Amino acid sequence: MNSQLVNPPHAFNYIESQRDEYQLSHDLTEIILQFPSTAAQLTARLSRSCMKIDHCVIEYRQQVPINATGSVIVEIHDKRMTDNESLQASWTFPLRCNIDLHYFSASFFSLKDPIPWKLYYRVSDTNVHQRTHFAKFKGKLKLSTAKHSVDIPFRAPTVKILSKQFTDKDVDFSHVDYGRWERKPIRCASMSRVGLRGPIEIRPGESWASRSTIGVGQSEGESEIENELHTYRDLQRLGASVLDPGESASIVGANMAQSNITMSVAQLNELVRTTVQECIKSNCNSSQPKNFK
């Protein structure tokens, strides 16, 4: 295939594949895309460049009866990922809907590896026989190269519906989310200095997580000094009911001082006098003499 670099020299023209007929299949079937020629890829590789897809257009043109039903699912996969994580974007649209699918890549790939992108289709819930040549697909790719990768602003996939009897309510498309990242701190012997005031400086034998206050919980080997500096750390993990100390001592004392029992001075004196007499009586009574036989 003839393919040339365009001006500026780091961008390729749109590379079009042949508009070929494809057989109806319920299983994922590859759509052949045309990529830059081996010579063009070798030129970019010799310049130590990496490559990305700027824009990919997949043209779908149906050739089925008007009473045909079913849905077509088109998927773009990145084969650098494991099989269950390779899906990058997907579209679902009616079998009889002529449509253009648009995809914009968000990553570079090395020219030392095989081109990783693969395009697949399958048909579901249809009344058309399998292996019927139900449609034609055509792919158009625009790629570019760079000396090194840079962050690429995300552009969502989209569609252009060409059949008037269908609207955007009849199609759906999606894109994979960003991969999750969880920092895993490097454990080191100097973690006893975590939390000390002052500018953070990484020293030999230390990691950023161990020096910063945003690191995760410390290991079992941390020093006693660290425990003394952070006596009450991780208390936020307890529930509010556990951390609530209850009413203060002043409130408790005030509540105890408040009573519904009232006594006059005379009644209080009588109570004290009676109590004292009972105590004297119980302590001063002589014991009964024992009889010896």
From Swiss-Prot:
Q: How does it assemble?
A: Binds to dimeric supercoiled plasmid DNA.
Pfam families hit by this protein: Gemini_BL1 (PF00845)
Family indicated by similarity: Belongs to the begomovirus movement protein BC1 family.
- PTM (free text): Phosphorylated.
Checking InterPro entries in the record gives:
Gemini_BL (IPR000211)
**The keyword Phosphoprotein is assigned to this record:** yes
Q: Which organism is it from?
A: Potato yellow mosaic virus (isolate Venezuela)
Membrane topology note: Peripheral membrane protein
The protein's name:
Movement protein BC1
Gene Ontology cellular-component annotations: host cell endoplasmic reticulum membrane; host cell plasma membrane; membrane
| An MF annotation (GO) of this entry | DNA binding
Q: Which cysteines are joined by disulfide bonds?
A: none
Spell out the subcellular localization from the entry.
Host cell membrane; Host microsome membrane; Host endoplasmic reticulum membrane
Q: What does this protein do?
A: Transports viral genome to neighboring plant cells directly through plasmosdesmata, without any budding. The movement protein allows efficient cell to cell propagation, by bypassing the host cell wall barrier. Begomovirus genome is shuttled out of nucleus by Nuclear shuttle protein (NSP) and the movement protein transports the DNA-NSP complex to cell plasmodesmata and facilitates further movement across the cell wall.
List GO BP terms, alphabetically.
Answer: transport of virus in host, cell to cell
Q: Which UniProt keywords apply?
A: DNA-binding, Host cell membrane, Host endoplasmic reticulum, Host membrane, Host microsome, Membrane, Phosphoprotein, Transport, Viral movement protein
